[in-house]
């Protein structure tokens, strides 16, 4: 129901739609032949800024109530972390064009403007109306067991930051 109701796609984000995904389940019984009396599951929801977070949380509560009526189960929902994204940096902001120019000049990279469905250090600046960008060279291993960072990438990123400082 949530994916259908909140189906807007925004090409600036990766993924381009809101997500409502179960990401962690805690152990509840010690043996395979025991039916658990309780279950504890965590969801990671990344909501596009177009939506009202409180409305989505209300919809989740309503879904839980419907399931309780249907099954007799008791469902308790607890929000462990909630963050409403601040207004995004304008794609034409000076810092955006400066970073794109630096990437083109120093690394021959044609950058595209985008966002992620999660928190970054830029959010703290955007909350106080400072346009901010986030960028780095990565191998797409974040939050995985084999997560790593290459020294070569860090050095190349430092060259971009140095170029930006020279232009400021």
Go through the PLM ranges and name each one.
Residues 1-168:
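Metal-dependent amide/peptide-bond hydrolase catalytic core
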């Amino acid at each position: 129901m949530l994916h259908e109701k909140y189906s807007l796609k925004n090409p600036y984000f990766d993924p381009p739609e809101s997500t409502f995904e179960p990401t962690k389940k805690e152990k509840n019984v010690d043996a395979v032949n025991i039916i658990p009396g309780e279950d504890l599951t965590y969801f990671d929801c990344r909501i596009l800024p177009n939506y009202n977070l409180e409305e989505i949380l209300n919809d989740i509560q309503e879904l839980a109530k419907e399931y309780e009526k249907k099954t007799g189960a008791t469902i308790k929902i607890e929000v462990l972390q909630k963050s409403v994204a601040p207004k995004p940096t304008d794609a034409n902001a000076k810092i955006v064009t400066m970073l794109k120019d630096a990437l083109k000049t120093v690394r021959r990279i044609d950058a595209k403007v985008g966002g992620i469905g999660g928190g970054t250090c830029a959010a703290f600046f955007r909350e106080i109306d400072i346009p901010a960008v986030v960028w780095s060279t990565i191998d797409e291993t974040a939050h995985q067991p084999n997560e790593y960072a290459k020294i070569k990438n860090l050095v190349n990123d430092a060259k971009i930051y140095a170029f930006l400082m020279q232009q400021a």
